[in-house]
Amino acid sequence: MLSKLTVALCAAALVIPTAAEARLSRAETRMTQVVDAEQQRTVDMLATWVNQNSGTLNFAGVARVGEMLRAELAPLGFKVEMLDMTKAGRGNHLVARHKGNGRGKKLLLIGHLDTVFELDSPFQRWERNGNDGTGPGSGDDKGGMAVMVAALRAMQAAGTLKNADITVFLTGDEEDAGPVEISRAAFIEEGKRADVALDFEGLVQLDGRDMGSTARRSSGEWTLTVTAKSGHSSGIFTPGSGSGAIYEAARIIDTFRREVPEDKLTFNVGLIGGGATAELDAGKVRVNATGKTNIIAGTAIARGDLRALSQEQIARAQAKMQAIVAQPLNGAKATLEFLPDGYPPMAPTEGNRAILARLNGVNQDMGLPEMGELDPVKRGAGDISFVAADVDGLAGLGPASRGDHAPGETVDITSIFVQAKRAAILMSRLASERP
């Protein structure tokens, strides 16, 4: 028979919190419990979203996913509206506003409804295999929206959502944005009203360690067009015939490679073509060229991107590239055009690092390892960059995934729940602080 002391000790052990729970408030502990209790609900919700195609150009599909999100957010007290993006030639954005007590920091939560997988993609359905969830957008960014909704539901259950001022902005064209002066105008205005921006795109892991994203590089496009005197190839390199357009394009691009590089700056050549004639198609993804081996090339075209960490770095790189273009070989002329509709950079500011520090406070209280600061070279551009000049922010609050943007994209299901707990506690703490 157990002694009274033994029974008492066993009973006490049942109510003694773990070390991590002891560092969390009662409401925060409740949030972690709700996320765990709703795991199957969250996975089922994500599967439903994934099984609805919402490729960027499938406007009806984007709208249907938007309505699915409305059905999740409205019961939590959010006023939801869809912003018509017809003038931008894109699907609609979803904006949901939760009015709190007006005393805490105003939060802007960022994600996107669309995926890269259009209606003609063979990759269309969700499939679960243990901890892996495979399907279009399972990670990018329907998995991120699942983290967001799971966190907000946990906040409501714990009572921390009631007083929080939160705006959710889910774009319908993140993967292929329409003209930014139209498609991002309302989003930029929301950034100016917010105190903190949180981006629910994917979590990056390095060597098994979760990383915090305080910065994202820009993404812009450029087009190089070279023209030269065409003629019989027997005259190539002579003063009268020159070197032709292809040699000049090669000179320019190779000089870019040798003279423009600097830390955190990359520039890729993704398309090139030339010949006696060459022209881009309407979508600027193909070069239609003609030529013969005995004709000096009269035209060459190349397209590429440029990614940088600051506007100053962009300006510096563009100036170097233009200077190289301005020194043509004999008989050639070239123009270099930078397209204006790019994604700006999100620089690694001290304000952003302060939010990562707050998240690491959450990690410590949850008994999780500290998250290091990710090198921005290791992730692409994102919508948060459009508001980065106006508000402190943190990216990468979505789940971990692999194979994004390709058939077989797979989300780490366990990471959805870890990220939802982190986000719920972080948002609750930030929303209770004075701006």
Region spans (language model):
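Gram-negative bacterial Sec-dependent N-terminal signal peptides
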Residues: 1-20
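Metal-dependent amide/peptide-bond hydrolase catalytic core
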Residues: 23-28, 221-223, 229-435
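Acidic/His- and Gly-rich active-site-bordering loop/insert found
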Residues: 23-136, 156-162
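Extracytoplasmic/secreted envelope proteins and their assembly/folding machinery
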Residues: 43-47, 66, 70, 145, ...
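Sec-exported extracytoplasmic/periplasmic mature domains
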Residues: 47-55, 70-79, 153, 157, ...
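Alpha-helical metal-binding/catalytic segments enriched in His/Glu/Asp
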Residues: 109, 129-179, 220-226, 235-259, ...
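Short, flexible, mixed-charge acidic loops at enzyme active sites
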Residues: 118-128, 215-218, 282-287
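Acidic/histidine-rich catalytic neighborhood of metal-dependent amide-processing enzymes
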Residues: 141-215, 274-284, 435
